[in-house]
Amino acid sequence: TERSRLFAAPSAPDSVAAWLRRYLEALKVRHANPINLAARRSQLARFNAWCVDAGIATPAEVTHAQLERFQRHLYYARKPNGEPYALNGQASVLANLQAFFRWMVRHQHLPSNPAADLDLPRTPSRLLREPLSLTEVEAVLALPDLAEPYGLRDRAILELFYATGIRRQELANLKVADIDTERGCLLVRQGKGRK
């Protein structure tokens, strides 16, 4: 996208883009999850594009008031289909900015963190209020067409989710060798938080 190209373009050593690239490199060196790193890169590229439009050249020029304006920009921004961005996405962008500015202060590149007291949007709880009933579980497990190969695959995926409670990315990372049929166990190589 245009935003990503702008982020990757050559820039002055003290520019927002240059510092964001250094920050992402520091995360990469610390073995950050590649999927999370890609998401952070996209979100920080969005902030960089906003800084370019706002005439903010360096991180030292960023103030708390400007970050509040960026937060309002996120709130009023629309997807290509005209829908607003989800609150969880807005909160994630702002949390990544807080982490970036915290890193800048920790490594003595800035004297203070302009994002320190930024109020993040309240996001609704995503947990189920109550677990699915046995009837509901059976109805979900009966959805795949077991006469089709994709149906068998989908049923196995649903069974794994239900029986183990693993996360979507953990399931996507599973290999056949991670299944111990003798003991009835799964080896989850990389769970949330690198666990």
Per-range role (PLM):
Residues 1-195:
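Conserved catalytic core of the tyrosine transesterase superfamily
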